[in-house]
Amino acid sequence: MSLINLTFKKIRNEKRPVLLTYTVAGDNSKKKSLEILKSIGKYADICEIGFPHNTPIADGGQIQSSAYRALKNGIKIKDVFSIVKDFKKSKQAKP
């Protein structure tokens, strides 16, 4: 069973809602993005990390702004994977 499925099963047994958060990788800076993930990861059950792209037309205004800031700051796909890797090293087994 995947870590996400295990998390949902655990939370369902606790009879509470799941706190699933979302952030765009690289918004503000690579370092700050990791700090934000570590901070929200203390409370979130699942952390979703978005890849910034230059045509986020299906996303809302806040996510569009975050994606544009990340791209303006030079975030690359390899940086997103690096942020995720560093986050997973610093965090317990959260999806």
Please place each PLM-identified region on the residue numbering:
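N-terminal amphipathic alpha-helix/helix-capping segment at the start of soluble metabolic enzymes
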Residues: 1-20, 83-88
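Active-site entrance/lid segments in N-terminal catalytic domains of soluble metabolic enzymes
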Residues: 2, 25, 36, 62-95
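Amphipathic, alpha-helical segments enriched in basic
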Residues: 8, 15, 22, 55, ...
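Short secondary-structure boundary/capping segments within folded domains
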Residues: 10-14, 27-28, 38-40
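Short coil/turn connectors at secondary-structure junctions
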Residues: 14-18, 42-43, 91-95
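Active-site mouth loops of central-metabolism enzymes
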Residues: 19-35
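Hydrophobic faces of well-ordered beta-strands that scaffold small-molecule active sites
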Residues: 19-23, 47-49, 95
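Glycine-rich, proline-tolerant flexible connector loops at the mouths of alpha/beta enzymes
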Residues: 28-30, 41, 46-76
